[in-house]
């Protein structure tokens, strides 16, 4: 008897989530560790209370099909979500250097914008764990626009929430 279509879809979703947990290639992971650096998820796990992290947009991938970027790893190079520090809710993003050198592209920026907006809307601290190469030049001006959105949100949050 064949699996139920829903079971197949849930299995596919689980495989995608597992792939997202290990988005960067093994050689990039090894280079980070050889430099004594933690990976993006390791930094989040180290910073937040154990088991408190809730990830947002884990399966997001870039849309820059015309840019020549063939690889489309999940997370698009940034992990976003919320958790707690000593029981207090905080929002966090952590750039993943193993995916495109942690360079900011359009979807990457949208994920940061979203988590920053959520932090501001609930009055919770916003934590950025940065380890990136700057703008993803292959995506052109949309990368720079992404930085503009981050800076604008920094200004809007200034004096309102810790960041």
Predicted features and spans:
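Terminal-region recognition feature
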Residues: 1-163
């Amino acid at each position: 008897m064949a699996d139920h279509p829903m079971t197949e879809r849930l299995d596919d979703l689980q495989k995608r989530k597992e792939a997202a947990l290990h988005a960067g290639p093994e050689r990039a992971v090894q280079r980070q560790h050889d430099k004594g650096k933690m990976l993006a998820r390791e930094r989040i796990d180290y910073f937040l209370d154990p088991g408190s992290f809730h990830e947002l947009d884990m399966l997001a991938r870039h849309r820059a099909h015309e840019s020549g970027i063939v690889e489309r790893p999940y997370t698009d190079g940034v992990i976003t979500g919320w958790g707690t520090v000593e029981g207090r809710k905080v929002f966090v993003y952590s750039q993943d250097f193993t995916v495109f050198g942690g360079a900011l592209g359009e979807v990457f920026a949208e994920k940061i914008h979203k988590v920053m907006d959520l932090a501001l809307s609930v009055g919770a601290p916003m934590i950025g764990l940065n380890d990136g190469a700057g703008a993803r030049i292959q995506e052109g001006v949309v990368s720079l626009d992404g930085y503009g959105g981050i800076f604008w949100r920094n200004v809007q949050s200034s004096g309102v929430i810790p960041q």
